[in-house]
Amino acid sequence: MSLHLYNTLHRRVEPFEPLDPACPTMYVCGPTVYNYVHIGNARGPVVFGVLAALLRRRYGALRYARNITDVDDKINTAAQEQGVPISAITERFCAAYREDMKKLGVEPPDIEPEATAHMPQIIAMIEQLIERQHAYVAMEHVLFAVNSFADYGQLSRRDPEEMLAGARVEIAPYKRDPSDFVLWKPSSDQLPGWDSPWGRGRPGWHIECSAMAAAHLGETIDIHAGGIDLQFPHHENEIAQSRCAHGSSTFARVWMHNGMLNFEGAKMSKSLGNIETVHGLVAKHPPEALRYALLSAHYRKPLDWSEALIAQSVRTLNRLYGTLRDLAAYPAHPFIPGNIEAALDDDLNTPQALAELATLANEARIQLADTTHHAAAEVTAALTRLKAELLGAGLALGLLQQTPEAWFSQGTNESDETHIQALIDARGAAKQARDFVRADAIRAQLAAEGIVLEDTPHGVRWMKQHT
């Protein structure tokens, strides 16, 4: 099966055929760096990171850009509230975002353009829009004339009144039409600004992505992706700007949108006070469990985020890493099995891929428990294959990329491990002396410290209990 992706533009799953099979292009909308990103912001980078890896395997190369919005009124407000320079806000939270993504196993994109580094391209695109009569200057603002673009609304498929309500547009005296949106606006001395033909000012949010996508990927790109909340007005406006500036019929050939996260059944929002930041979550939970949870539902569907979901993800990874630990004697190199690739080819069906991963682990455990019924060579071959496929399936999903020992001991340091081993040895000595009361007391002491013991034919194994 070839790669098929759901195209929001056409509302259907379609075969993916890149303009240049030697190197597809993909642009994903990144964060506005005014605070720590919440877990909902991480779903896109995780999911579309899986897609990026798939495209590289399939085509041999990929040009992937994910932007940073580092000029925005939210950033200005944060700097004013905290009494620090704007650069202090953007540098701090840009670094935090990259660190959070690294912990979640998100590979960096090929290009991570920042808006402030692309002012010449942004200004040039606005000039093109004015020249082509798709934009106008009014009271030191430059605005896009929505009624100049006949295809406006083709992505969101909303009628004009619905679009006007959905955009929460500002009714301003400098607008010819309420639906027109800002490309450039004036800046006071206290706000960041750049010299332009229309005076000192700063760009609107939408034009930044259009200019950066064109600068790094060209006038027409293969895939443009982001959260469903960006479909309108942000992506709708990107299409209008880009097509009108370049005089082209297509800006992005495939539009992909990931669903939103709910928290404990309610919409995740600041007003409800139920925002969970990645920064806070990785301090409390294994980052790989957060990644697993983000992949557990199909990317286009809403995902109900909860402590129960995280706990279930931890338990699943315990089983997977436990299986790999039991396969330690069987050296193997990762091999991605066909059913994993088939699941991902089916519009990134990560839940199906995770189910296939669990099946591989179950098969391995059955083989491990049933070794007496087969010839040694046959068992070794089967377990080596299953381990290779387990590792390969994990590789395709960005999972199982650490050793079982690292997974089970995370949250501990060298002195902790020395202390734990000393107690395990003491428990072993107590059992040898048939002092089972003492042995049970040591097990209980370790449990109170968050350490779970497992007695196996190969000796005692321990793991840090994660929540």
Curated annotation (Swiss-Prot):
Keyword flag Transmembrane: no
Which subcellular locations apply to this protein? Cytoplasm
The UniProt record gives the binding positions of Zn(2+) as C29, C209, H234, E238
Locate the motif 'KMSKS' region. 267-271
- The EC category is ligase
Q: Which one Pfam family would you cite for this protein?
A: tRNA-synt_1e
Report the co-factor binding details. Answer: Binds 1 zinc ion per subunit.
EC numbers:
6.1.1.16
| Cofactor (UniProt) | Zn(2+)
Q: Which SMART domains match?
A: DALR_2
Protein name in UniProt = Cysteine--tRNA ligase
The catalytic activity, as recorded, is: tRNA(Cys) + L-cysteine + ATP = L-cysteinyl-tRNA(Cys) + AMP + diphosphate
UniProt-listed GO biological process terms: cysteinyl-tRNA aminoacylation
